Amino acid sequence: MHAQNDIPKAEILRGATIAFDLDGTLVDTAPDLVASLNLILAEEGLPPLPFDDVRKMVGRGAKALLERGFAAAGAPLDADQAPALVERFIALYLGRIAHESGPFPGVVDALVALRASGARLAVCTNKLTHLSVALLDALDLTQYFDAVVGADSAPAAKPDPRHLLATIAAVGGDPARAVMVGDSINDALAAKAANVPTLLVTFGYTEAPVETLGGDLLIDAFSDVPSACITLLTSCGRGNAGL
């Protein structure tokens, strides 16, 4: 179902934890990720990949993106060469991390509204933590988050629920009063296993139709995040219990 455009209610959001995926949810990172992948493919004498093909590969971390990218280019990564290529890719990407990337429309206003309502905000991403912080810093978004937990800072990466639970714990939150906002099957699976409701955006990088991923609520615009979180916290009996 799709969220209704309600007026955010501070008492429901106050003290709740809203955990966000990064790539394809908060920020449209595909342009710089695609460019970085195609640069390293060119260095290896391989043809570039179409933008839309690579866009669907984003969200599982740098190593997974390289593995899928090289396979799609017809040269599956050899286990011995993978570490050096991943390191090279990360260096290339860090050098252009926000050249063409930017927050999706409505992100800043929604984050401001959520913080004003007393919610605890965190980033739960399969991106490496230092890359995530560098991206958020470059886009002036770090100020809105109480914690940034990349795959390398968690016991295991999404879809393992421990990633989401560690993110909630990092802000002193309670899984019983939390929402996961994402765009992919990894977000949906991690949240389901952690018993946290999932809000999925329809404009992200998922390969499968977002309607098939098992999210509790879908939104077409980021401006609907505050009202959708209220809906989920209320319908799941997770509203502010007099805190």
Task: Go through each PLM region and give its residues.
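Asp-based, Mg2+/Mn2+-dependent phosphohydrolase catalytic module
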Residues: H2-I18, D52, V112-R115, T129, ...
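Conserved SAM-binding loop
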Residues: A19, L26, P103, L121-C124, ...
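Hydrophobic alpha-helical core bundles mediating ligand binding, dimerization, or RNAP-core interactions
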Residues: L37, L41, V58, A62-L66, ...
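Alpha-helical substrate-recognition element adjacent to the catalytic core
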Residues: E43-A73, A79
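Residue-level detector of anion-binding/catalytic polar loops
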Residues: P47, R120, P197
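Metal-dependent phosphoesterase signature
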Residues: A71-D109
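Substrate-recognition element of Asp-dependent hydrolases with the DxDx(T/V) motif
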Residues: T25, L37, V107-D137
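Active-site neighborhood of HAD-like aspartate-dependent phosphohydrolases
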Residues: I7-K56
